[in-house]
Amino acid sequence: MTSRKIPSIMGTQHPDNANAPFWESSQQPFISAYRETGEAFENFNELNVDEYMWDWEGKHADAAVIDRLFSTEYDYFKDHQIGRDKFLTFRFPNIWEEKGYNLMQAMTAFLSSEDFAHDLGFSRPLFEAILPMAQRADQILKMQVLFEKLANFKSAEFTRSDKNTPYIEMIPLFEDFETQLHAPEILKEYLNLHEEHFGFRPKYMRVFLAGSDSALTAGFMSSITGNKLAIARLHEFAEEENIEIFPISGTGSAIFRGGLSPHRIDRYVTEFPGVRTATVQSAFRYDFPIEEVQKGIAELKEKLPVAEPLKISLDDQKILTEIAEESAKFYSNTLDNLVPSMQAIFKAFPKRRDRRQHVGVLGYSRSVDGIELPRAINFTGSFYSVGVPPEFIGFGRALKHLDADHLSVFVRSYPSMSKDFNELARFVNMDALQILKTQNSAWAEVEEDILIMQRIFKFEIGPQTREEQQHAEIALQVVQFKDGAPVAITALINRMAQLRHFLG
């Protein structure tokens, strides 16, 4: 069993917060790159997160983060050492998807931080990194080989005293259904490549499963099913290969993106048992009273490490795989036709972080059937902003399409389904949907999804609280004026986000 502490809570920089952070005196929800070092400390200190993701993928990041934290908060980090008690985990850029100009900068930060920590008598602060959009075993090893070469070069040419550690641990981030489903096969090949190069097999691995991009590209039914299959198969793999696997689940507060909020802790643990690290994104941390946030984090820390991992029989795995693949077709076919009518909303969507340009030389884009999509938070919030939660897209028709055996397995695998869609129905605005239908007939398919779910679960469609009523009224305004002034639409989207406690 690994002797290191495995973090239960990872704070992230996902820009899904509606409100200003609790530590932000200006009460502005936008968080500049210059404030993110202080943000990391506040999350360690005030919220007691175990780990904080430092994101280099498609955004600006400060390479001096460790130097700044040690210099400004020396007493705290003397007692709560990064790399031993608290963890700062870099998410590297994926050099197969973007130019990766800052990969060497990120890797160099590992080395200089180790030097600084050594001089202070601290533990090595940075020793593992996330590889986003991992597709193949050789990509995971490539990151380690590049780091090894850089560390050895620095030790030979620039270091006069102790040599740098020429090894980092990698956390593959599997983002789509196929890579999540086949994570065990990818990891098996990686372990062989690792042993071939380094002469030993890791005793443990942390494996990151995305909840947002899988929903964006294949729909909510496929995403939640894929996450469950991956968790179950990873724990099976751990037993077969005699290696400890600690799954990380990337989930936002919107149900479409995983549904983890301070109000849904039990639901999360029920749906994803076997996850050992949960991401608490910006909405979780900043869109609820701080006492509720602290309580939710404490509860997750108590429940995640001891939850009995999800077990799915081979027969049920086969059925769930078929369900995920079929449901993705309903989602994608409809989405292809909806995206053009959502462009004005996507463009007006408010920003919360310093991002690099999304496409072209500096970045990359997500796409479905060749159609470019915005990031998952923008996408999710945009559909909520027109009164149509994206969880419904394709879900109703896919559910109706299931035969008795498939339906039985799916219902058993998703115990919160009825409760989730009862909640989601309160954010549906049928008046707004009727207007959207007159502009684009593809919205009729989404209406069909909603009505099928209503017939099955007997829920009421529309708001049930004062805040939800305000949300519905604003959604109608957004639809009526969506091609008007973007500044006005942005203001409306911001207000709706505050009412539902997440931006997207």
Curated annotation (Swiss-Prot):
Region (Disordered): 1-21
Keywords, alphabetical: Carbon dioxide fixation, Lyase, Magnesium
Superkingdom, taxonomy of origin: Bacteria
Database matches in InterPro entries: PEP_COase_arc-type, Pyrv/PenolPyrv_kinase-like_dom
UniProt GO MF annotations: magnesium ion binding; phosphoenolpyruvate carboxylase activity
EC nos: 4.1.1.31
Family under the similarity heading: Belongs to the PEPCase type 2 family.
Protein name: Phosphoenolpyruvate carboxylase
Source organism per UniProt: Leuconostoc mesenteroides subsp. mesenteroides (strain ATCC 8293 / DSM 20343 / BCRC 11652 / CCM 1803 / JCM 6124 / NCDO 523 / NBRC 100496 / NCIMB 8023 / NCTC 12954 / NRRL B-1118 / 37Y)
